[in-house]
């Protein structure tokens, strides 16, 4: 007798090991960088703050937090069908993102060990945190009779090269938006405990503080490198990364609105709250933030949401490959145009809040 609960439509490398999700523009990326340039950075303009953050990392507040308790010791077969599939996809995306951070931070710690020991230790301790997160999420997947082969993921993924300053922008925003995502879900479920369908969400309050501390580290790094914040190019790049991170989250989450509905959340409202909070937080270090309260911002993102629905419909059709490609061209062009217009929207200058050593 086939147990359909165990395998809700997932491909497997081998029994119980899920094939990693196909890489797309919206899936978590794996990064590498110029390690020599990173090692040569002068961090003296903000060394005191970096040393204070290192001391926080050494304390390891969450050393005993990621321990599964008795609330996990039950069958989860009642989470079935589409809900089960959406939940496993959520765990996979989260695990992949955390594991990506682990690999980057671990390699930075190794490469900088003899050249910049302060930064090396910070990166090693952050990799410790990310490894815990990824392992905890992967263990959660096993409750649904699946897991990820993280060794296979390490070898099979394509790595995106970013210069150090782009790593700073991207990882700062990734950590801070991760904080706001986790704490927003936690606070909602704290008020609505009947919507907590699985105990991993009960760990999010302490968990998100790791994300917050990691973000503070990259905040301090950028303040030690004023050129990443204080010239006209920095403003353009900050705008680009803010838009990229916000748009990626919005397009991903609206596509998976049913998952958030399982938690009693409305995906768009949730995303708008997270984007607003992350945008405000970024204003403490970035010279500009996005005008996310301008109706044009979400109107254009909604056009992209609609376009992506059309792209998925074309992929699901039985048309020949050439016909599919031709049908997609105007939709890709529309998405590109929406992002250009979003990028050109006037940002909000917050220079008075940024660029100075705290």
From Swiss-Prot:
Its EC number is 1.14.13.81. The keyword Metal-binding applies. InterPro entries: AcsF, Ferritin-like_SF, Rr_diiron-bd_dom. Its cofactor is Fe cation. It catalyses: Mg-protoporphyrin IX 13-monomethyl ester + 3 NADPH + 3 O2 + 2 H(+) = 3,8-divinyl protochlorophyllide a + 3 NADP(+) + 5 H2O. GO terms for biological process: chlorophyll biosynthetic process; light-independent chlorophyll biosynthetic process; photosynthesis. Keywords: Chlorophyll biosynthesis, Iron, Metal-binding, NADP, Oxidoreductase, Photosynthesis. Pathway: Porphyrin-containing compound metabolism; chlorophyll biosynthesis (light-independent). It is an enzyme of class 1 (oxidoreductase). It holds the Pfam family Rubrerythrin. CDD domains: ACSF. GO terms for molecular function: iron ion binding; magnesium-protoporphyrin IX monomethyl ester (oxidative) cyclase activity. Catalyzes the formation of the isocyclic ring in chlorophyll biosynthesis. Mediates the cyclase reaction, which results in the formation of divinylprotochlorophyllide (Pchlide) characteristic of all chlorophylls from magnesium-protoporphyrin IX 13-monomethyl ester (MgPMME). Belongs to the AcsF family. NCBIfam families: AcsF, PRK13654.1. This is Magnesium-protoporphyrin IX monomethyl ester [oxidative] cyclase 1. It comes from Synechocystis sp. (strain ATCC 27184 / PCC 6803 / Kazusa).
